Amino acid sequence: MLYENMSDSFLLSDAGLEFDEALLEVDQEKDDYLDDFENWTVVPVETIEGINYYPNCLPESVQRNLINNVPKELLSIYGSGKQSHLYIPFPAHINCLNDYIPSDFKQRLWKGQDAEAIIMQVYNPGDGIIPHKDLEMFGDGVAIFSFLSNTTMIFTHPELKLKSKIRLEKGSLLLMSGTARYDWFHEIPFRAGDWVMNDGEEKWVSRSQRLSVTMRRIIENHVFG
């Protein structure tokens, strides 16, 4: 499904198109396992196999160019959880993000190809996303770029009762594959800020509006409907 511009994609994603509806489910899949975190073990995020994090991955010029070309309705402060779904070919200011995904990641997981499906998600202060794993219609390998501000992502492994967290900074890239993609749940808590370690102690940091760009490949021969 091809769109001439991002505005078309944003408007059509609310129209109930089958492919878009399937993609919407990606960020709404959840198992009711989180009764509480008591007796869970906190582990460093670096110990989770399949997670790679690149702070300051994107130049400021690339970040500004993308934000300047995002439809105003997507970045509106009114309403929560707004998404824009894009499929190849992407506009140039978005397609260039493929250049910042490590080539060995693409070679190993995407057969050397670029992403072919993107979800742009806006988070206003207080917004979040429930614990979930990506749908099986997506192949291994997820790339998440962060724009505008920072947030904290939580990882949980209910079978092993393990939990972890990572600070996703503006301009950063988070890669998930293998164990991190298939065995761990990830979420962004619904709250107005995050506890962040600073000078040896945790301090509450209020959130600002954030835009995430999540890039994936679709499993070959996947059929909708």
Curated annotation (Swiss-Prot):
Q: Where's the Fe2OG dioxygenase domain?
A: 114-219
Instruction: Give the matching InterPro entries.
Output: AlkB-like, AlkB-like_sf, ALKBH7-like, Oxoglu/Fe-dep_dioxygenase_dom
Q: Name one GO molecular function term.
A: ferrous iron binding
Spell out the Pfam families in the cross-references.
2OG-FeII_Oxy_2 (PF13532)
Give the domain of life.
Eukaryota
Locations listed in the record: Cytoplasm; Nucleus
- Which keywords, in A-to-Z order, does the entry hold? Cytoplasm, Iron, Nucleus, Oxidoreductase, Vitamin C
Keyword presence, Cell cycle: no
The UniProt entry's GO biological process terms, in alphabetical order, are:
cellular response to hypoxia; DNA damage response; fatty acid metabolic process
As recorded in UniProt, coiled-coil segments are none
Task: Identify one Gene Ontology CC term for this UniProt entry.
Answer: cytosol
Q: Does the keyword Hydrolase apply?
A: no
UniProt main location, coarse: cytoplasm
Family to which the UniProt record says this protein belongs: Belongs to the iron/ascorbate-dependent oxidoreductase family.
Q: What is this protein called?
A: Uncharacterized protein P8A3.02c
Task: Look up and give the organism this protein is from.
Answer: Schizosaccharomyces pombe (strain 972 / ATCC 24843) (Fission yeast)
